[in-house]
Amino acid sequence: MLWNYQVATPPYLYQEILANAGTMQNKGLEIHLSAIPVQTKEFSWTTSFNYSTNKNKLVALSNEEFQLKSGYIEDGWTGEPIQQYTHRIFEGGEVGNFYGFKTIDIDSEGRWIIEDKNGNPKPISEQQAEDKKIIGNGLPKHLLSWDNSFTFKNFDLGITMRGAFDYDILNYPRMFYECPVNLTRGNLLATAYEPKYGKTVLNDQQELQYVSYFIERGNFWKIDNITIGYTLK
């Protein structure tokens, strides 16, 4: 696993070097099935299905030569004006974990209530770094694809579909444009004035925050491609 490590100078020319010092473990399963369910003189149907699942683990971030004392790395970036890392990867943990404050409610003044390190409610104004926790994972646990090909006389039809399941996404547009404080900075989504947790809208002085409220399920199933053809004879 590649990461930037602090090194001594000399012998190295620079104080930081990109090195492949980490160790990653992946365990998974892939299944592929194909069949011709129907085949006659004028009509045929060929189908294939693929399924895969994978579980990863960051075994180590350091080796004998390159050391990372923290035991974790932070990656992803919200950008201005929030300016926070979105992911933290621990030794012994999974890659792709969203790491931040877990919102559990909103108070009567429209300010977030988060869960502290012990699982108790706390106003977000009293947030501490140790209150952050894993709030989702952006890597799909299940990947599927289904391809179908049909022929009828000189006509042919192909349909390709795929899906990904059991993973999360960070909804950036909502995180930035669903907070009334942004009205003085630009546009807002219509949902900015919808009650949060069924109670009240966000306070127009509530600063933009990277919190679990904007983490959503990313599950999808879509048609990637449809082709129709005719063969001249």
Identify the role of each PLM range.
Residues 1-12, 45, 50-52:
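Membrane-embedded beta-barrel scaffold of Gram-negative outer-membrane proteins
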Residues 2-6, 56-72, 76, 167-191, ...:
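Outer-membrane beta-barrel and related beta-rich outer-membrane complex signature
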Residues 5-16, 120-130, 200-212:
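Flexible, solvent-exposed coil segments and beta strand-coil junctions
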Residues 16, 26-30, 44, 141-145, ...:
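Transmembrane beta-barrel architecture of outer-membrane proteins
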Residues 25, 35-37, 51-57, 152-154, ...:
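Transmembrane beta-strands of outer-membrane beta-barrel pores
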Residues 41, 154-159:
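Repeated loop/turn-to-beta-strand initiation elements of outer-membrane beta-barrel proteins
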Residues 164-233:
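Extracytoplasmic gating/loop element in the C-terminal half of outer-membrane beta-barrel translocons
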